[in-house]
From Swiss-Prot, chain A:
Record gene name: pbs-3
Disulphide bridges, residue numbers: none
Protein name: Proteasome subunit beta type-3
UniProt similarity note: Belongs to the peptidase T1B family.
Biological function: Non-catalytic component of the proteasome, a multicatalytic proteinase complex which is characterized by its ability to cleave peptides with Arg, Phe, Tyr, Leu, and Glu adjacent to the leaving group at neutral or slightly basic pH. The proteasome has an ATP-dependent proteolytic activity.
GO cellular component, one term: proteasome core complex, beta-subunit complex
GO biological process: proteasome-mediated ubiquitin-dependent protein catabolic process
Keywords: Cytoplasm, Nucleus, Proteasome
InterPro entries on file: Ntn_hydrolases_N (IPR029055), Proteasome_beta_3 (IPR033811), Proteasome_bsu_CS (IPR016050), Proteasome_sua/b (IPR001353), Proteasome_suB-type (IPR023333)
CDD domains: proteasome_beta_type_3 (cd03759)
Binding partners and assembly: The 26S proteasome consists of a 20S proteasome core and two 19S regulatory subunits. The 20S proteasome core is composed of 28 subunits that are arranged in four stacked rings, resulting in a barrel-shaped structure. The two end rings are each formed by seven alpha subunits, and the two central rings are each formed by seven beta subunits. The catalytic chamber with the active sites is on the inside of the barrel.
Curated annotation (Swiss-Prot), chain B:
Cellular compartments annotated: Cytoplasm; Nucleus
Family: Belongs to the peptidase T1B family.
Known partners and oligomeric status: The 26S proteasome consists of a 20S proteasome core and two 19S regulatory subunits. The 20S proteasome core is composed of 28 subunits that are arranged in four stacked rings, resulting in a barrel-shaped structure. The two end rings are each formed by seven alpha subunits, and the two central rings are each formed by seven beta subunits. The catalytic chamber with the active sites is on the inside of the barrel.
Classification lineage: Eukaryota, Metazoa, Ecdysozoa, Nematoda, Chromadorea
Domain of life of the organism encoding this protein: Eukaryota
The protein, known as: Proteasome subunit beta type-1
């Protein structure tokens, strides 16, 4: 079994019309054993920028601390909020600095920039960024998610539609991915508020 | 006294050549510069995977089966754009298989000949339930050198209801409402879970009925979604529709070709 699927977990993000949705499951495991059922893999960076870290959760924690450190330093030096584009570049650089001994985590960035344009991107473990206009997924349930998202995503979805599409996608994924589950948390980021919903899913 | 030296020289040379050949053979069999893992990797493998995906949905009085028609080598090299993975065994049994194409063809042949013999012995067509059991046993018969295929058997059972049977390579059988197998299985299955199984819908909500038209459009959607992301799936959808009391309909629908 690969280290990338040791703890399990899945993160997905979808872009809409002046809004983005980012969701993750809540399970942490040690291979087949479930250790915790309340671990969000999505973290707040600024009011409108969130980062998701799938993969090996021990590394994910370390990477999160490094991300927060660099983001704080950036905001102190520049005296402005960090844009999602900048943050993803920063994380990409951080990941590539460890090119030959990488952190086993795949980061995902979702947020709105200062013109409220949605931005989503995902990376591999060494920071190769892919920023499509529709949706991204990382983690053990990636394949399951991409299949469903491909059918649910439409152009210019409003926040409530976007939430529904994201929630349905991750729930369908959790149905089949044994390494993720125990509920999901969905963040809907719009220009004036962030809506957090915890959704019940299979408990096995 | 000097006349025989030529012959011994030739004899020595032949002997030397034989020894050289022997040494070459030995070193080819046990190359010392390669790790055991490298040797393992280069060894001949009786199996290969030609990609592609198949899917089947059953309803109250129908069963539909679809597969793509692409055949690939090493997931990137397209061997043909019209390889058929669906076999209509008789008016109410359809077999669809993906995986190792050699075994796909062999499995099809084996079932065809068994059905032919059944027709000869009993003067009637086999029912889908019987065929499902037959296929399971045929797969398990090869327990230790399996057919490297994910098979799905679909059709109309004796009561006129749609049936889908799903198998693993060694014949573990399950009757399901819908099933998928092949490279894009993880992309198709959760979508059908959501749309047909309604697993993400809370209790108390109205569930739309699964009509033939809805099943066909879901099938098209799932293959379009799969072809978008999975590179060994594409080119055409080969769609077979079996409805109780009606002849089997075969359709080809376009899909991504890149």
């Amino acid at each position: 079994m690969s280290i990338m699927s040791y703890t399990g977990g899945t993160v997905v993000a979808m872009a809409g019309d002046e809004c983005v949705c980012i969701a993750s499951d809540l399970r942490i495991g040690e291979q087949m054993t479930t250790i915790a059922t309340d671990q969000k893999k999505v973290h707040k960076v600024t009011d409108k920028v969130y980062v998701g870290l799938a993969g090996f959760q021990s590394d994910a924690r370390t990477v999160l601390e490094k991300i927060m450190f660099r983001k704080n330093l950036y905001e102190l030096r520049e005296n402005r909020n960090i844009k999602p584009q900048v943050l993803s570049e920063m994380i990409s650089n951080l990941a590539y600095q460890h090119r030959f001994g990488s952190y086993f985590t795949e980061p995902l960035v979702a947020g709105l920039d200062d013109t409220n344009k949605p931005y989503i991107c995902c990376m591999d473990t060494i920071g190769c960024v892919s920023a499509p206009r529709d949706f991204v997924a990382v983690g053990t349930g990636q394949e399951y998610l991409l299949g469903v998202c491909e059918n649910f995503w439409r152009e210019n979805m409003k926040p409530d539609e976007l939430f529904e599409a994201t929630a349905q996608s991750i729930l369908s994924c959790l149905e089949r991915d044994a390494a993720s589950g125990w509920g999901a948390v969905v963040y809907t980021i719009t220009k004036d508020k962030v809506n957090v919903s915890t959704i019940k899913a299979r408990m096995d | 006294m000097t006349s025989f030296t030529g012959i011994t020289a030739v004899a020595n040379a032949t002997n030397e050549m034989a020894m050289f050949k022997q040494a070459m053979k030995e070193v080819a069999a046990h190359p010392e510069w390669m790790s055991s893992r490298q040797i393992e990797r280069q060894r001949w493998n009786p199996y290969s995977m030609e990609g592609g995906s198949t899917c089947a949905i059953s309803g109250e009085n129908f069963a539909i089966v679809a597969s793509d028609t692409r055949m690939t080598q090493n997931d990137i090299n397209i061997l043909t754009r019209d390889a058929e993975k669906i076999q209509i065994l008789n008016d109410n049994i359809i077999l669809t298989t993906s995986g190792f194409y050699g075994d796909v063809l062999q499995l099809k042949k084996v079932l065809q000949s068994r059905l032919h013999k059944y027709r000869f012995d009993y003067r009637s067509d086999m029912s889908v339930d019987l065929c499902a059991e037959l296929l399971s046993r045929n797969l398990y018969y090869r327990r230790f050198f399996p057919y490297y295929t994910g098979a799905i058997l679909a059709g109309i059972d004796e009561h006129g209801k749609g049936a889908v049977f799903s198998y693993d390579p060694i014949g573990c059988i399950e009757r399901l409402g819908y099933s998928a197998s092949g490279a894009a299985e993880p992309m198709i299955i959760p979508f059908l879970d959501c749309q047909i199984g309604h697993v993400t819908l809370s209790e108390g909500y109205e569930r739309p009925e699964l009509t033939l038209d809805r099943a066909i459009s879901l099938m098209k959607d799932s293959f379009r979604g799969a072809a978008e992301r999975e590179i060994s799936t594409g080119d055409k959808i080969h769609l077979v529709i079996a409805e109780a009391g009606k002849p089997v309909v075969v359709k080809f629908l376009p899909l991504r070709e890149d």
